[in-house]
């Protein structure tokens, strides 16, 4: 690769690192093509970009970004997974793949919204429910008191009508 190509790659990678909500690093030593293709397809379906990048280019690209703390992990074969939208789904795919391929794919570290996270943190992130499920639970929690209040308000007139009806039936019976 000539110098201009490297500079262009560094600039593109720098832009991607700045836009990414989460970045995960992995060691892919010993992976075969079939395994790599499977991982790429799973990550693509989760809207995650996966690249194998030279460590020196990655170190240059990470400068002046909130992902610069990852530079201590730029050793050996390094793959980078960039999540621009949902970090939980990216962590789920990577964590699951690391469990199924423990000898060939190992997570190194990550950055989530500017903060460095360990492999254990990535696993914890993977154990979270998806964003949609969390939003649904939150909305259900917010909606529950309102629904109960409406039920109570509806019960008061209903009770009043039933009481009036009982009085009417009692008077008609006499």
Curated annotation (Swiss-Prot):
Keywords carried by this UniProt record: Ribonucleoprotein, Ribosomal protein, RNA-binding, rRNA-binding
InterPro entries: Ribosomal_uL10, Ribosomal_uL10-like_sf, Ribosomal_uL10_bac, Ribosomal_uL10_bac_type, Ribosomal_uL10_CS_bac
Origin: domain of life: Bacteria
GO MF, one example: structural constituent of ribosome
Example GO biological process: translation
Pfam (any one): Ribosomal_L10
CDD domains associated with the record: Ribosomal_L10
Any one of the GO CC terms: cytosolic large ribosomal subunit
PANTHER family in the cross-refs: 39S RIBOSOMAL PROTEIN L10, MITOCHONDRIAL
NCBIfam families: PRK00099.1-1
Subunit structure, as described in the record: Part of the ribosomal stalk of the 50S ribosomal subunit. The N-terminus interacts with L11 and the large rRNA to form the base of the stalk. The C-terminus forms an elongated spine to which L12 dimers bind in a sequential fashion forming a multimeric L10(L12)X complex.
Stored HAMAP family: Ribosomal_uL10 (MF_00362)
Assigned protein family: Belongs to the universal ribosomal protein uL10 family.
Function: Forms part of the ribosomal stalk, playing a central role in the interaction of the ribosome with GTP-bound translation factors.
Protein name as catalogued: Large ribosomal subunit protein uL10
Gene: rplJ
């Amino acid at each position: 690769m000539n110098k201009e190509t490297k500079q262009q790659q560094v600039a593109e990678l720098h832009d991607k690192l700045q836009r990414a909500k989460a970045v995960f690093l992995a060691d892919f030593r010993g992976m075969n093509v079939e395994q790599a293709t499977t991982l790429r397809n799973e990550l693509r379906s989760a809207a995650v970009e996966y690249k194998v990048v030279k460590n020196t280019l990655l170190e240059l690209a990470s400068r002046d970004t909130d992902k610069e703390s990852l530079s201590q992990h730029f050793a050996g074969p390094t793959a980078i997974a960039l999540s621009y939208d949902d970090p939980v789904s990216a962590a789920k795919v990577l964590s699951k793949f690391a469990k199924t391929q423990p000898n060939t794919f190992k997570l190194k570290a990550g950055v989530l919204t500017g903060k460095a996270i360990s492999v254990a943190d990535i696993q914890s992130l993977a154990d979270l429910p998806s964003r949609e499920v969390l939003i649904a639970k939150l909305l259900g929690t917010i909606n529950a008191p309102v629904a109960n209040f409406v039920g109570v308000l509806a019960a008061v007139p209903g009770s009043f009508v039933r009481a009036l009806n009982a009085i009417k039936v009692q008077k008609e019976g006499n």
